[in-house]
From Swiss-Prot:
Its main location: membrane. It comes from Methanopyrus kandleri (strain AV19 / DSM 6324 / JCM 9639 / NBRC 100938). Keywords: ATP-binding, Cell membrane, Membrane, Nucleotide-binding, Translocase, Transport. Pfam families: ABC_tran. GO terms for molecular function: ATP binding; ATP hydrolysis activity; ATPase-coupled transmembrane transporter activity. Residues 1-229 form the ABC transporter domain. InterPro entries: AAA+_ATPase, ABC_transporter-like_ATP-bd, ABC_transporter-like_CS, ABC_transpr_CbiO/EcfA_su, ECF_ABC_transporter_ATP-bd, P-loop_NTPase. Its EC number is 7.-.-.-. One of its GO terms (cellular component) is ATP-binding cassette (ABC) transporter complex. It is found in: Cell membrane. It is a peripheral membrane protein. This is Putative ABC transporter ATP-binding protein MK0182.
Amino acid sequence: MTHEYPDGTCAVCGLSLRVKEGESVVVLGPNGSGKTTLLHHILGLLTPTKGHIRVLGHDLPDGVREVRKRIGVVFQDVDDQLIMPTVLEDVAFGLVNRGMPREEAFERAREILERLGIEDLEDRPPQFLSGGQKRLVALAGAVAPEPDLLILDEPTSGLDFRATRLFVRLIRELKEELGFTMILTTFDVDIAAALAERVVVIREGKTVAEGSPEDILTDVDLIRESGLKPPEHVELLRRLGIENPPLDISEAEELLVAMLGEESRGNP
């Protein structure tokens, strides 16, 4: 797929992406690499200059209506999607739009708000919430219809450590409960490590690497060349002479403890 803007700028330059049903794919790349443009094509918001897009068995743009009924999305700027007077109305909005009776939609919205631990926000205006609260409300609206495909565009951008950790935990749990396919974009290698079953690295609108998180995210040279920051524990272990450092932080800790133990035994 290729997408060129009217001035000739190539935002996506021959990029190919295949996602299996039920898979969690993280598209990893620096700002300006084409991640959001790619998602806009999957959502039918843009039409490619060249190439073909097929989502959930439907060719776009012809099947865009059917596709959108089966997709949940959290945009990078969630203010663009939180449009109703209250949180409860916002979460119920997509359900009502899909034809669910209003009372049933509000009941389902309350269930998902409670599931995410934000039921106390249901009467609050979304525009007055914190950044982390807004992301959770947007996530509630995205998963309330139990989508086949969940799309998350830079979902932890601007969140502090605690909010990021909560968001990641909830995504993992919801994925397990609902079984949706997931495509997530980010520049944060740690988020990719936490949520990806497969990682696709893009730079300047092109795929530069694809594979398991263990293979991709521990390749320090690849990550740096792609304009990204490698996981700190991976960098540390590489400096200590470990050629193939583990991606899992617990395994890294065990390895460091073992190395320190060997060093202490060798230096009584």
